[in-house]
C-alpha cells in the first residue's frame, strides 16, 4: 500500500487474499487516522488492486459499508481532515455519533418562541416571519440562513438547533453578521459565516449522504507579528 499526499491525497493498494484487519491496520498507519472494523470484517480475506485513487473512492473499493468522520476548518483551504474511518458489516448500523467526534461542552439556545416548525398560515404571518432578524431552515440537505445584524454565536446556535446537533461556543466574540445564504450544503454556509468555525461531518459513502455532527466556534488563531 502506498499513500501520497501530493498533489492531493491518493492511495494505491495491491492485496491478494490479505486479512482485512491487516489492510485496515496498514491504512491507519499510513493515514495516521483510526480505522474501525465490523466484527465480521476482522478475519475476512480480500483481494483488491487499485492505484492513485482519492480517499473516498479508494475506501469504497475496500468495503461495501463505509463511514468517514471529518473535521472542516472554515479558515483553511485544506481539504476536510479525516478523523476516523469505519469499515462496518452490512447490517451493523451506523457508528455512534461520538465515536471519534467528542466535545466537553455544549452551548444551549434559549428562546421564547415555541412555534418553530409551524408554517405561517396567513399573508400577515408570512410577512412577519420574513421580517424576523434571524431565520434558519434545513430542507433536503440544504441550509438557508437569513440574518440581519445578528451575533455569530446566536446564528450558530440556531443552526445547531435546526440540524439537531451540539454547538460549542469557545469564542465569546460577539461579531455581528449580516447573511443572506440560500439552500447550500452546511459546509458551504459555515465557510461564508466565519473563518473560525470547526464543522464535524460524517460521510456515509454507501448511501452517498453527508451530515453534520457538531459545530465549534473556536478562538481565532494567535498571529505573531513580525518585526520589520
Tell where the protein language model's regions lie, with residue ranges.
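N-terminal targeting/assembly segments of extracytoplasmic apparatus and virion spike/baseplate proteins
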Residues: 1-228
Amino acid at each position: 500500500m502506498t499513500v501520497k499526499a501530493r498533489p492531493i491525497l491518493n492511495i494505491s493498494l495491491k492485496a491478494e487474499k490479505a486479512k482485512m484487519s491487516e489492510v485496515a491496520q496498514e491504512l491507519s498507519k499510513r493515514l495516521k487516522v483510526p480505522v474501525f472494523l465490523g466484527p465480521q470484517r476482522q478475519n475476512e480475506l480480500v483481494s483488491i488492486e487499485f492505484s492513485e485513487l482519492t480517499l473516498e473512492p479508494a475506501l469504497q473499493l475496500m468495503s461495501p459499508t463505509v463511514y468517514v468522520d471529518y473535521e472542516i476548518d472554515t479558515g483553511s483551504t485544506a481539504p476536510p481532515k479525516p478523523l476516523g474511518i469505519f469499515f462496518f458489516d452490512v447490517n451493523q448500523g451506523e457508528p455512534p455519533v461520538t465515536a471519534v467526534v467528542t466535545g466537553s461542552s455544549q452551548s444551549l439556545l434559549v428562546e421564547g418562541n415555541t412555534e418553530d416548525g409551524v408554517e405561517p398560515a396567513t399573508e400577515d404571518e408570512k410577512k412577519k416571519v420574513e421580517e424576523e432578524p434571524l431565520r434558519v431552515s434545513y430542507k433536503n440537505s440544504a441550509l438557508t440562513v437569513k440574518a440581519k445584524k445578528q451575533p455569530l454565536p446566536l446564528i450558530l446556535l440556531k443552526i445547531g438547533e435546526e440540524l439537531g446537533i451540539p454547538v460549542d461556543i469557545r469564542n465569546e466574540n460577539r461579531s455581528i453578521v449580516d447573511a443572506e445564504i440560500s439552500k447550500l450544503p452546511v459546509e458551504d454556509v459555515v465557510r461564508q459565516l466565519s473563518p473560525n468555525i470547526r464543522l464535524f461531518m460524517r460521510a456515509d459513502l454507501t448511501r452517498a449522504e453527508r451530515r453534520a455532527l457538531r459545530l465549534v466556534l473556536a478562538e481565532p488563531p494567535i498571529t505573531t507579528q513580525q518585526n520589520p
